[in-house]
Amino acid sequence: MYEWLNALPKAELHLHLEGTLEPELLFALAERNRIALPWNDVETLRKAYAFNNLQEFLDLYYAGADVLRSEQDFYDLTWAYLQKCKAQNVVHVEPFFDPQTHTDRGIPFEVVLAGIRAALRDGEKQLGIRHGLILSFLRHLSEEEAQKTLDQALPFRDAFVAVGLDSSEVGHPPRKFQRVFDRARSEGFLTVAHAGEEGPPEYIWEALDLLKVERIDHGVRAFEDERLMRRLIDEQIPLTVCPLSNTKLCVFDDMSQHTILDMLERGVKVTVNSDDPAYFGGYVTENFHALQQSLGMTEEQARRLAQNSLDARLVK
C-alpha cells in the first residue's frame, strides 16, 4: 500500500523548513560554513534523535539550525524538501519558517527569506509544486519580540500568506500573542497556530477565539473536550495533525493509540503532515503509511485525509 499512498495527490500544511534539515545536509553546511559540530558523524547525530518530549527535541532542533548561515544554505534546505515532495506527489506546500531562530543569531531576515523564496519559486516552475509561506513566531519568546519580527516582515508582505505560532507550548498560551495576531490580521495576513499538542484543549479555544485562526496545527488534545469537538465538526476547522511527530514526542505512547482516524470518522477535518521529518523519521507518505500499519487505515480513509489537505489550503 506504500506505493499507492505515495502516488496519492496531497498537500502538506504543517511543515517546519528548519525541521527538514537531514543529518547529511547538516554536516555539508557545517563544512561549507566551517562550523564545528558536537557530533562526530552522521550516525552519531542520528542516535541523538531520541526525544522524550517537545523541549528535548527543540534543544536539538535549534542547535542544528545554527549551520544555516547564507542565502544559499536556506535555498538548499528548502530545495531538498521540495524534491522529497515531488517524489511523494505532494502538489502543494504551506511551510513554516521561524525567522527568530535565525535573526537572534545575527542572520538578517532578508537573507533567510531570499533563499527560501527562491527555492519555492523554482519548486513551482520546475517541479509544479504550489506554495504559500507562513511566518511563525516563537512562543517561548515575548510578544514584544514577535512584534519586532512582524515589523521586519512587513516590507516583504507579499511573501507570506499567514502568520503562525510554534515552539514550546506549555506555559505559553495563545492569549500571550493576541495583540500581535490582531495586528497581523489588520495588515492582511491570515492566521494559524500550534495548539493542543502538549498544551490543553483550552489553548485550542484561545487560538480560535483570541487569535481567530483559520487552522489549528496539531490539535489532537481536542479529543478530550466534547464541546470543542462539536465546534471543530460544525465549523469544519481543519487540524494539521502530525502522527509520527506525536509518537516521537510522546504525545501518544504508541501509534496504535492515535486518535486521528477516530476524529476523521467523527467528521473533524483532519489532515496528515510530517512536522519536522528529518527528526521524526518520515515525510508525508511515511506518516500515511504509519496510520495504515498501526491503525488499519483504509484506502477510502486515506483518500479523505488527502482531500482534506487539499481543501484546507490557505492558497487555493
UniProtKB/Swiss-Prot annotation:
Cofactor(s) the protein requires to work: Zn(2+)
UniProt GO molecular function: adenine deaminase activity; zinc ion binding
Top class in the EC scheme: hydrolase
E.C. designation(s): 3.5.4.2
Note accompanying the cofactor annotation: Binds 1 zinc ion per subunit.
Active site (catalytic residues): 197
GO CC aspect terms: cytosol
Residues reported to bind substrate: 276
Similarity section: Belongs to the metallo-dependent hydrolases superfamily. Adenosine and AMP deaminases family. Adenine deaminase type 2 subfamily.
Annotated protein name in UniProt: Adenine deaminase
